[in-house]
Amino acid sequence: MKAQTKSKKVNKAWLHDHVNDTYVKLAQKEGYRARAAYKLKEIDEQLGLIKPGHVVVDLGSSPGAWSQYVRRRLSPDGAAVGQLNGVIIALDILPMEPIEGVTFLQGDFREEEVLAGLQEAVQARPVDVVVSDMAPNLSGVESVDAVRIAHLIELAVDFAVHHLKPEGALVVKLFHGSGYSQLVQLFKDTFRVVKPMKPKASRDKSSETFLVGMGLKRQG
């Protein structure tokens, strides 16, 4: 009974914070599906990653807030329905409501067949930016979760190495904790410029952070 009472208090506190969250209100006002859009928006505004004409791949895209933001960046009319100057390919294991101009593939990025489908959708076009909001189902066991998180990020890095333009960029979500320093080193080994970032829209209580890699190093 005590555990249930504590759980109810936690859920009530989370709901209160969520309803009163500045970015939740802003997302509703500006038509974004989730407050996460403002994390990518801040990163992009600081670094100038996404530009009209770009080919962008969005990994872990559902519910679609990041793809919505990218679409607005690639459209002369912003959020309005109409012309799109660029290509957006989104992928998630979960379903995603359609977004005009976004090619969506549903599947598990860890499976070779799904990865092959993504590569086919890219059609050998050099990719300008890969953004990844992928996260595994967390078990609560840090050592287990660290391995799952690292695996997804390693797959994203491998995809970027094979598909990014030499001057392209990769943005990934990760969490401070076990394995963090190794993932930062992986980025440093792969990219010429590496920037850890904690956008304002990322909750203070969360260990969530983002790594941005820009400009591929020569491999081999």
UniProtKB/Swiss-Prot annotation:
What does UniProt list as catalytic? 173 (proton acceptor)
CDD domains recorded: AdoMet_MTases
Question: At which positions is S-adenosyl-L-methionine bound?
Answer: 64, 66, 92, 108, 133
UniProt keywords, alphabetically = Cytoplasm, Methyltransferase, rRNA processing, S-adenosyl-L-methionine, Transferase
EC number of this enzyme: 2.1.1.166
> Domain of life of the organism in this record?
Bacteria
GO cellular component term of the entry, any: cytoplasm
Name this protein carries in UniProt: Ribosomal RNA large subunit methyltransferase E
Is-annotated flag, keyword Methyltransferase? yes
Which compartments is it annotated to reside in? Cytoplasm
* A matching Pfam family: FtsJ
**MF-aspect GO terms:** rRNA (uridine-2'-O-)-methyltransferase activity
Job of this protein? Specifically methylates the uridine in position 2552 of 23S rRNA at the 2'-O position of the ribose in the fully assembled 50S ribosomal subunit.
Q: What is its main location?
A: cytoplasm
Family that this chain belongs to: Belongs to the class I-like SAM-binding methyltransferase superfamily. RNA methyltransferase RlmE family.
Q: Which organism is it from?
A: Acidovorax sp. (strain JS42)
